[in-house]
């Protein structure tokens, strides 16, 4: 049986796309996924261009594949994702042994690209932006576990000054309303209990409602997803403060299936820096969203993205960012030092802050966030958490593990419970009393209801 190996870089959108690459090749050619690159007949790199030196990391990986290709001449090597969109045919120029180059919107064409490569002997490049076409050509998802991602839109139209995403993934395009609901319903029928709705700016969703001129916004989509039998939890990422409507805020007051956690990237807490970033909101507007959410859910868990060392960032600007972090009490974050991306407006900004200063700021920010994370975990001891059981514990297969609404892994034992009964609990929602907090997980005991 032929096998495909996929290495994924970057965001959850890329993770979703990688799963779809496997689904497409399985449905068309019977390829099965493998974790061993040396066993693969097809090797795909799903790339990300958000961080610095992304291109060089890709070519470094490709260089290691050259020897493997020499031993296995029929091996197919492909490069997809955002670096593929940026570099296109130049990837083949630098690495002639690459067989196919494809963008995020053309992954569904992989079987045809591979077939043309094998037929013609010529490397194939397709980095076009066909609007939403790929979703019409994807096979049904192969479910693994009780949680699943569902992409509801593609691209970004915000054009933040530092970001390459609009150039690599295209403008915002929403999937039709009924298509999203049909995919979620299909997943629920296969045992999925938790869906994560995905988009570059997921709350900018504007989906056409079949046969009418009406458009469904993100809040309406969530309401309908919540009505699908079997779906018990709804997450989404990534949201944009500029698109966080009052309708979406109000939904947290009446939709229990929306988890009590939100990832809402702020990037910075200086209005001057936010303006230079072209984010489209002020710090006050951002804090207003959190204030209104916590009026409805006082213990709402928050996470965010932060960029440290944006050109012109002063000590006073950074102090404002740290003040916001302390005020909100973020529970995890994705934080980075600014790296200029070629072709973006911010790449041309004057930057006179020494790298050592930026690094020191980042370390201070990350240490503060980590203190918040540990404090929140310790405060969960003694509470009863509703968790979705995902499967056996990684360290002890006789135990089970699941996740809380704020994404904590919880391990728990079931002494005296037969294996068959434990297996039936996978995919179920259970109450667990938290007894211990560790740096990266929690431990608890299942609560038996009388």
Curated annotation (Swiss-Prot):
InterPro entries: Elp3/MiaA/NifB-like_rSAM (IPR006638), Methylthiotransferase (IPR005839), Methylthiotransferase_CS (IPR020612), Methylthiotransferase_N (IPR013848), Methylthiotransferase_N_sf (IPR038135), MiaB_methiolase (IPR006463), rSAM (IPR007197), rSAM_horseshoe (IPR023404)
Cofactor (UniProt): [4Fe-4S] cluster
SMART domains for the chain: Elp3
Keywords of the record: 4Fe-4S, Cytoplasm, Iron, Iron-sulfur, Metal-binding, S-adenosyl-L-methionine, Transferase, tRNA processing
Keyword Transcription regulation part of the UniProt annotation: no
Localisation: Cytoplasm
Cofactor remark: Binds 2 [4Fe-4S] clusters. One cluster is coordinated with 3 cysteines and an exchangeable S-adenosyl-L-methionine.
Binding site for [4Fe-4S] cluster 2: 156, 160, 163
All residue ranges annotated as the Radical SAM core domain in the record: 142-375
EC primary class: transferase
Membrane spanning stretches: none
PROSITE patterns for the chain: MTTASE_N, MTTASE_RADICAL, RADICAL_SAM, TRAM
EC number: 2.8.4.3
CC annotations in GO: cytosol
Positions that bind [4Fe-4S] cluster 1: 11, 48, 82
Main location: cytoplasm
Ranges for domain MTTase N-terminal: 2-119
Function: Catalyzes the methylthiolation of N6-(dimethylallyl)adenosine (i(6)A), leading to the formation of 2-methylthio-N6-(dimethylallyl)adenosine (ms(2)i(6)A) at position 37 in tRNAs that read codons beginning with uridine.
Subunit structure: Monomer.
Name the UniProt record assigns to this protein: tRNA-2-methylthio-N(6)-dimethylallyladenosine synthase
Organism: Cupriavidus pinatubonensis (strain JMP 134 / LMG 1197) (Cupriavidus necator (strain JMP 134))
Lineage of the organism: Bacteria, Pseudomonadati, Pseudomonadota, Betaproteobacteria, Burkholderiales
Gene name, Swiss-Prot/TrEMBL: miaB
